[in-house]
């Protein structure tokens, strides 16, 4: 049995084998895994919002936003030996948890989170190898840096690996 490192909402962490890393409660939030399969290190961020410009400066949490969480996660991974050029990404989440009468862009948080994460990963030149995003159901994800498998449990849809 592996030791599981848990990542809370608007949080991030890094692991090495035999540890795995997990986050629960991904609705409109996006869980992003960055991993170096040569060094066998991985990190996960539970991103709540697309853009740090939405945040209040006095209580700023870099792990909460797509544009700042991935930079922070990258620096934590490099601190434990990851090489930026070896990093790959997997992601899940970004569901539309509620339906709204209007097509107001502000209500599409899940889709906006996914778009912001993809944009930031492009800027960092980190390829996305697999994703399970969108839909209308919550997810729990767990990543194993040894096998490079992201296990995804989706409400009412069971479990799969990417």
UniProtKB/Swiss-Prot annotation:
Name this protein carries in UniProt: Chemoreceptor glutamine deamidase CheD
Please explain the role this protein plays, according to its UniProt record: Deamidates glutamine residues to glutamate on methyl-accepting chemotaxis receptors (MCPs). CheD-mediated MCP deamidation is required for productive communication of the conformational signals of the chemoreceptors to the CheA kinase.
Which key words are in the record?
A: Chemotaxis, Hydrolase
Q: Which transformation does this protein catalyse, written as a reaction?
A: L-glutaminyl-[protein] + H2O = L-glutamyl-[protein] + NH4(+)
The Gene Ontology biological process terms listed for this entry are:
chemotaxis
Which species expresses this protein natively? Halalkalibacterium halodurans (strain ATCC BAA-125 / DSM 18197 / FERM 7344 / JCM 9153 / C-125) (Bacillus halodurans)
A molecular function annotated in GO for this UniProt entry is: protein-glutamine glutaminase activity
User: How does the record describe its quaternary structure?
Assistant: Forms a complex with CheC.
């Amino acid at each position: 049995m592996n030791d599981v490192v848990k990542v809370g909402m608007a949080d991030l962490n890094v692991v090495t084998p035999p540890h795995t890393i997990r986050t629960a409660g991904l609705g409109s939030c996006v869980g992003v895994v960055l991993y170096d399969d040569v060094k066998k290190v991985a990190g996960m961020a539970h991103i709540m919002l697309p853009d740090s410009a939405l945040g209040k400066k006095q209580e700023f949490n870099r792990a909460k936003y797509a544009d700042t969480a991935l930079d922070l996660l990258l620096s934590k991974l490099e601190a434990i030996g990851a090489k930026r050029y070896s990093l790959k990404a997997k992601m899940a989440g970004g569901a539309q948890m509620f339906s709204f009468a209007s097509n107001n862009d502000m209500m599409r948080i899940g889709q906006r989170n996914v778009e912001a994460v993809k944009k930031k990963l492009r800027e960092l030149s980190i390829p996305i190898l697999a994703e399970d995003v969108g839909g209308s159901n919550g997810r729990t994800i767990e990543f194993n840096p040894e096998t490079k498998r992201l296990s995804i449990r989706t409400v009412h849809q069971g479990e799969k690996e990417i």
